[in-house]
Amino acid sequence: MSDNTAEQQDIQIKGKPVSGRTWKVEKEPLRAKNRVVKNKKLTSWELKKQKRLEDQQFKEKVRALKEEKKAEKDAVIQALKERRAKKEEQERYDRLAAKMHAKKVDRLRRREKRNKALKER
């Protein structure tokens, strides 16, 4: 109890010293939670910083969207190229098959002519 009363006296006594000399103000520890002021107006630097951050985020979003769009476009172009190459290859095979078929038909005709000529003798 005596300790408690001594502390109360120290708290009450603090004021201007008897000598009149001014001492440094006794500071309390910084408590960040108490310092936060809601709805306070931002300084010009904080506004600039916030705007810069928003611009940067916006640019990143735009860049990501552009990359996504470009990737989709590249995929479509690649599919188109593959389709055209496949079609060209198929046409080449068809031309070869037609040519081979014609050669085979010619061979058969020659054989038939030969056989016919042999039969007529």
UniProtKB/Swiss-Prot annotation:
It comes from the Eukaryota. The keyword RNA-binding does not apply. Residues 48-104 form a coiled coil. Its main location: nucleus. Belongs to the CGR1 family. Involved in nucleolar integrity and required for processing of the pre-rRNA for the 60S ribosome subunit. This is rRNA-processing protein CGR1. It comes from Kluyveromyces lactis (strain ATCC 8585 / CBS 2359 / DSM 70799 / NBRC 1267 / NRRL Y-1140 / WM37) (Yeast). The lineage of its organism: Eukaryota, Fungi, Dikarya, Ascomycota, Saccharomycotina. The gene is CGR1.
